[in-house]
């Protein structure tokens, strides 16, 4: 098993690290889209997140990591049968890679050919979506995915379950995961339907100052020289951040959401002309998750403002009369609205 680079040793890229951490605190936010040029640490940072994720209880022997305490209707066919409380075990939240060249059978699952040939029985071979249930599904170069794979992801993302009907099989199982995608926008555009499914979006850039670049090189060389020793050196910081994420997850439901926060989120999305209400809902949830991560009892306008660019930049319609970037448009409206909030006595 390869040794991953420590998350806390990554220099800069604060927006990306914050977005991934927020998604770990509240998986319901809807995933993270990371776009940027090659060599900016996108894949390294995303894979480093796996070591920070807490453990969850799963039904022993279940191929879908079903929650032993969840209501029966939300479980797989085997775990959903009436019975006593099933045996359970603890496991780290899974992070599953979806390779670019994966077939649809590998992604959604298919007939278990070996069992069919050896035993003459029709059995389902779970795919990557099953492995990612209650965890993270990572797609590198997500903007280059084939259309039929994108369609499968969209169907599952909308329903939270995977339905496979083929080769005489009819299988339905839970498939709720945090979708994390990375890619270089210069190599191809992401389909709007899939882009809208990401709760947060981050643009990463190559560091433009010499000290930062030197520090990145120094740390990377130290890691490549002795990976075990390097991880041991950063173990304390990794452990501290892991505990911080776990505490935030535990306290998330207790974080208050003031009325002014809801009103400001609605005004912001209305002013930017975002479609539907997904923007407001995600903005409020991410502000609350950030407050929980900071150990606060209530989300404030400061948290809302901090998360607004990541939540809204990929939801804007293209305006032929405004050539400004999405970030500039979001920041412009934020500045106007938050000045109003200050004048009205908001915090």
Could you say what each language-model-derived stretch is?
Residues 228-283:
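Conserved AAA+ ATPase small/helical "lid" subdomain
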Residues 25, 29-30, 50-58, 112-113, ...:
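Non-catalytic alpha-helical coupling and interface elements of nucleotide-dependent molecular machines
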């Amino acid at each position: 098993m390869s040794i991953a680079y420590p998350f806390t040793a990554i220099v800069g890229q604060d927006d990306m690290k914050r977005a991934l951490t927020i998604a770990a605190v509240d998986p319901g936010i809807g995933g993270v889209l990371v776009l940027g040029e090659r060599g900016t640490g996108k894949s390294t940072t995303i894979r480093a997140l796996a070591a920070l994720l807490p453990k969850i209880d799963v039904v022993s022997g279940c191929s879908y990591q079903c929650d032993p305490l969840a209501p029966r209707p939300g479980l797989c066919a085997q775990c959903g049968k009436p019975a006593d409380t099933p045996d359970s075990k603890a496991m780290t939240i899974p992070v599953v890679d979806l390779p670019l060249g994966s077939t649809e059978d590998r992604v959604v699952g298919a007939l278990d050919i070996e069992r069919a040939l050896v035993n003459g029985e029709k059995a389902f071979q779970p795919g990557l979506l099953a492995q990612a249930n209650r965890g993270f599904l990572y797609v590198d170069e997500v903007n280059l995915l084939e259309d039929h794979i994108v369609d499968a992801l969209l169907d599952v993302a909308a329903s939270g379950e995977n339905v496979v009907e083929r080769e005489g099989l009819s299988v339905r199982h839970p498939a709720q995961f945090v979708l994390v995608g990375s890619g270089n926008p210069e190599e191809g555009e992401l389909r709007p339907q899939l882009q809208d499914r990401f709760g947060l979006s981050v643009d990463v850039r190559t560091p433009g100052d010499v000290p930062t670049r030197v520090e990145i090189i120094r740390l990377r060389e130290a890691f490549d020289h002795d990976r075990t020793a390097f991880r041991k050196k950063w173990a304390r910081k990794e452990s501290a951040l892991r505990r911080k994420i776990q505490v935030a997850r535990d306290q998330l439901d207790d974080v208050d959401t003031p009325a002014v926060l809801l009103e400001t989120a609605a005004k912001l999305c209305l002013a930017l002309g975002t479609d539907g209400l997904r923007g407001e809902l995600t903005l409020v949830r991410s502000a609350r998750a950030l407050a929980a991560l900071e150990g606060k009892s209530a989300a404030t306008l400061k948290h809302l403002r901090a998360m607004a660019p990541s939540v809204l930049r990929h939801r804007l319609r293209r305006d032929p009369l405004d050539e400004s970037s999405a970030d500039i448009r979001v920041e412009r409206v934020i500045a106007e609205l938050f000045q109003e909030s200050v004048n009205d006595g908001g915090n």
